[in-house]
Amino acid sequence: MFNTTPINIDKWLKENEGLLKPPVNNYCLHKGGFTVMIVGGPNERTGYHINPTPEWFYQKKGSMLLKVVDETDAEPKFIDIIINEGDSYLLPGNVPHSPVRFADTVGIVVEQDRPGGENDKIRWYCSHCRQVVHESELQMLDLGTQVKEAILDFENDVEKRTCFHCKTLNYARPQSN
């Protein structure tokens, strides 16, 4: 039997806000065809997710910043997209993106289940020269845990974090200046 119980988002947030923890801060509400996630802020990550399918963002509380890389030209362009409270945004598939969520913010993200044989990637760009430092490829089976595992793997490996081009040591989490 399929699920017949609606979820009251406001009530769920009051009862479960402790589940939205760094570095990803997400909780999967629904799975099956699509994954519906509640995502809180602040988050602590520098990697860019590359999803082979589109992602839909809805900002329920506060604003967020979606950092994207436009790779349609020979020279990639790093672009910041502000998604304000009440806004929705549909990100096309295969666009590198890094959601920046601020304190006391809440969003909803909907991702389509991946077609067979299509993998997600988590990519880190050098903070100094913007070249690709490391990329992890994974068959996305559990959004609630796999992104976090990729972040921790990068964070714990200095070799993966060191830029081949300029030798800058990069980090999995933003560093205060």
From Swiss-Prot:
Chain positions recorded as substrate binding sites: 55, 101, 111
Pfam families recorded: 3-HAO
Keyword vocabulary terms for this entry: Cytoplasm, Dioxygenase, Iron, Metal-binding, Nucleus, Oxidoreductase, Phosphoprotein, Pyridine nucleotide biosynthesis
Pathway: Cofactor biosynthesis; NAD(+) biosynthesis; quinolinate from L-kynurenine: step 3/3
Enzyme Commission designation: 1.13.11.6
Alphabetical list of InterPro entries matching this protein: 3hydroanth_dOase (IPR010329), RmlC-like_jellyroll (IPR014710), RmlC_Cupin_sf (IPR011051)
Annotated residues for binding of a divalent metal cation: 126, 129, 163, 166
EC class of the enzyme, as a word: oxidoreductase
Chief place where the protein resides: cytoplasm
Keyword Calcium: no
Source superkingdom: Eukaryota
GO molecular function: 3-hydroxyanthranilate 3,4-dioxygenase activity; ferrous iron binding
Record-listed O2 binding positions: 45
Localisation: Cytoplasm; Nucleus
CDD domains membership: cupin_HAO
Keyword Glycosyltransferase attributed: no
Reaction catalyzed: 3-hydroxyanthranilate + O2 = (2Z,4Z)-2-amino-3-carboxymuconate 6-semialdehyde
Quaternary structure note: Homodimer.
Described function: Catalyzes the oxidative ring opening of 3-hydroxyanthranilate to 2-amino-3-carboxymuconate semialdehyde, which spontaneously cyclizes to quinolinate.
NCBIfam families in alphabetical order: anthran_nbaC
Entry's family note: Belongs to the 3-HAO family.
Protein name as annotated: 3-hydroxyanthranilate 3,4-dioxygenase
Organism annotation: Saccharomyces cerevisiae (strain ATCC 204508 / S288c)
